[in-house]
């Protein structure tokens, strides 16, 4: 419990919130679909904080890297690889939301991590 509270504190301290922007922990909570920081797994918080600092490069990542990041299901990762091979790089969030298995709501939640 102490560890998660420390992680939450550090995450909140590291991100400035101006009323419009969500903090790192708020972005993680939204992605994970939880209402409270205590409901987050500390491992997931560390992994996702790392992605906030070094976003996943979806146009360059291999299938294994896409799956390893933990943002996409196997189906979504395969679908993205297939899309890239047929159409080239994904150039916008709206283009990504058109990839099979994605959608505007999902892309909005993962956008800070990619």
Q: What residues fall within each predicted segment?
A:
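Structured, non-catalytic alpha/beta "coupling" segments that mediate domain-domain communication
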Residues: 30-37
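Amphipathic, charged-and-aliphatic alpha-helical interface segments
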Residues: 42-91, 110-113
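Long, solvent-exposed N-terminal ectodomains/accessory regions
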Residues: 38-39, 107
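Hydrophobic or amphipathic alpha-helical targeting/insertion segments
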Residues: 92-108
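Sec-dependent N-terminal signal peptides
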Residues: 4-13
